[in-house]
Amino acid sequence: MSAPPVDGTDLTGELPTPATGSLAARQAELVAALVAGGPPPPGFAPAPLAAARAALLRKRAGEVARHWPLLAAGLGPRWPAAFVEWAADRPNLGGLRDGWELARALHTRHALPALGAEELAAREATHRYDGTTAPRHRRWPAIGRADRAVAVQLAGRVRLLRSAR
């Protein structure tokens, strides 16, 4: 088997036309339609594409739930729908960062459940996350807050402070 040509032609030696585009461009359109909410590329039926997109979002919700189990448990049966609504037009940042962004978004909207607030407070106390780069462990004592939950990190240990009810 020979290596693919490097001069822009396809395996048959034909240059891509504006109608067909290069293979890489067509693949990019398909990926954008599946994971970034882009329009269906030419030649793809919208219904199967929507089904594949929904399956990928459910898989992504499961990955986030593994990293943020209290957030998912706090939302209960609303978890899949809440995640899909939030993630539909956002790129995949990985389970940890997606969960962090979702928890912060719910906190901003005052829709974060108590379990999710406790988990977010603990993460904010133990890690530094600016929303653009990967979270990093904090080395110094820190406090994380979310709604009524307060977490204190000292010497690598986290204590969750709960108010008396």
Which residue stretches match the model-derived regions?
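Long, compositionally biased intrinsically disordered regulatory segments in eukaryotic proteins
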Residues: M1-R165
